[in-house]
């Protein structure tokens, strides 16, 4: 999977794919790829909860990739940050 420079370079569907790739790497034999993906996730989302969005979701949120995207989208909009690429 190609990692993009900014969250604005991802469509929502592409970001869901990134989250699914993270899920897949969670069960890999090593964490080498997972570490890179998680660092990228934290960097481009800029969300203060970081990887807790994935591993420790709030009780009132869907913990699916789509639920994570929804929370990121809402937080970025509320904080005046650019959103996902339209596509």
From Swiss-Prot:
GO terms for biological process: bacteriocin immunity. InterPro entries: Colicin_E_sf, Colicin_pyocin. GO terms for molecular function: toxic substance binding. The keyword NADP does not apply. Keywords: Bacteriocin immunity, Plasmid. Belongs to the colicins ColE2/ColE8/ColE9 and pyocins S1/S2 family. This protein is able to protect a cell, which harbors the plasmid ColE7 encoding colicin E7, against colicin E7, it binds specifically to the DNase-type colicin and inhibits its bactericidal activity. Dimeric ImmE7 may possess a RNase activity that cleaves its own mRNA at a specific site and thus autoregulates translational expression of the downstream ceiE7 gene as well as degradation of the upstream ceaE7 mRNA. This is Colicin-E7 immunity protein. The gene is imm.
């Amino acid at each position: 999977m190609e990692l993009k420079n900014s969250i604005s370079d991802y469509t929502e569907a592409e970001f869901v794919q990134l989250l699914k790739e993270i899920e897949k790497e969670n069960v890999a034999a090593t964490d080498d790829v997972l570490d890179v993906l998680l660092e990228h996730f934290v960097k481009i989302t800029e969300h203060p909860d970081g990887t807790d969005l994935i591993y420790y979701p709030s009780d009132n949120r869907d913990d699916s990739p789509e639920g994570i995207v929804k929370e990121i989208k809402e937080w970025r909009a509320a904080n005046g940050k650019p959103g996902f690429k339209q596509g």
